[in-house]
UniProtKB/Swiss-Prot annotation:
Main location: cytoplasm
Protein name (Swiss-Prot/TrEMBL): Thymidylate synthase
Family: Belongs to the thymidylate synthase family. Bacterial-type ThyA subfamily.
Subunit composition and interactions: Homodimer.
PANTHER family assigned: THYMIDYLATE SYNTHASE, THYMIDYLATE SYNTHASE 1
NCBIfam families for this protein: PRK01827.1-3, PRK01827.1-5, thym_sym
Residues annotated as binding (6R)-5,10-methylene-5,6,7,8-tetrahydrofolate: H51, D169, S263
Classification lineage: Bacteria, Bacillati, Bacillota, Bacilli, Bacillales
Keyword line: Cytoplasm, Methyltransferase, Nucleotide biosynthesis, Transferase
Pathway membership, UniProt: Pyrimidine metabolism; dTTP biosynthesis
Active site: C146
Length: 264
């Protein structure tokens, strides 16, 4: 995707070398935005092969409100293992905040259900927002949310989504995040009777780890190939009824996978 290669170049050319929590070191910039028209294909990176199974199962895991890695491990997904405790628990991370936000009066708020209800009943609302950044619970999370807030927008029968990501690992994380939120937008559009519009990806601290520079430069030498298509295998009425088997990726022809170490 041209948008992704442009981001890589921007960080390499304009970034500052900074230390970071993990001790790895980064090349970092602050503030950047990419836009993807979901009518033009499913934005899954082609300059390296992505593991769609991990992307899809992680999203389904979020939507279940689950915060234990057991479901992920049972489905061959290991991306959260480094942060889990000995029982597989991560604390009140994404799934908990999306589905069981603890309100000021002790009530539990299902942000996803409320979001879908509001899209259906008040599509012009400017409050179609889900937040994972629960200040009162940050210290209890294994990893505070990197992709921390997203908003939906309905116009001309199309549903668009904008994500704010406070911290973005360009090589490992960002390709997953793009595909995950594009998939979420398409799923919500499906259950609300809308067409997918745009996915807008807005960053705070967007960085390339020092031990990923070689891999990023390799991707910049690779040509951008046509985007794949994503379709659903059946009609689904509820966002919570989707399964992995409902997602069909067609015409995905990426360059080979590139390995990179995770900074924990």
């Amino acid at each position: 995707m041209k948008q992704y290669k442009d981001l890589c170049r921007h960080v390499l050319e304009n970034g500052e070398k900074k230390g970071d929590r993990t001790g790895t070191g980064t090349i970092s910039t602050f503030g950047y935005q990419m836009r993807f028209n979901l009518q033009e294909g499913f934005p899954m990176l082609t300059t390296k092969k992505l593991h769609f199974k991990s992307i899809a199962h992680e999203l389904l895991w979020f939507l279940k409100g689950d915060t234990n890695v057991r479901y992920l491990q049972e489905n061959g997904v290991r991306i959260w293992n480094e942060w889990a405790d000995e029982n597989g628990e991560l604390g009140p991370v994404y799934g908990s905040q999306w589905r069981s936000w603890r309100g000021a009066d002790g009530e539990t708020i299902d942000q996803i259900s409320r979001l879908i209800h509001d899209i259906k009943t008040n599509p012009n609302s400017r409050r179609l927002i889900v937040s994972a950044w629960n200040v009162g619970e940050i210290d209890h999370m294994a990893l505070p949310p990197c992709h921390c807030l997203f908003q939906f927008y309905v116009a001309d029968g199309k549903l668009s989504c904008q994500l704010y990501q406070r911290s973005a690992d360009v090589f490992l994380g960002v390709p997953f995040n793009i595909a995950s939120y594009a998939l979420l937008t398409m799923m919500i559009a499906h259950v609300t009777g809308l067409e997918p519009g745009e996915f807008v990806h807005t960053f705070g601290d967007v960085h390339i780890y020092q031990n990923h520079v070689e891999q990023v430069n390799l991707q910049l030498t690779r040509d951008v190939r046509p985007l794949p298509k994503l379709r659903f295998a059946r009609n689904v009425d509820s966002i919570f009824d989707f399964t992995f088997e409902d997602f069909i990726i067609e015409d995905y022809d990426p360059h080979p996978h590139i390995k990179g170490a995770v900074s924990v």
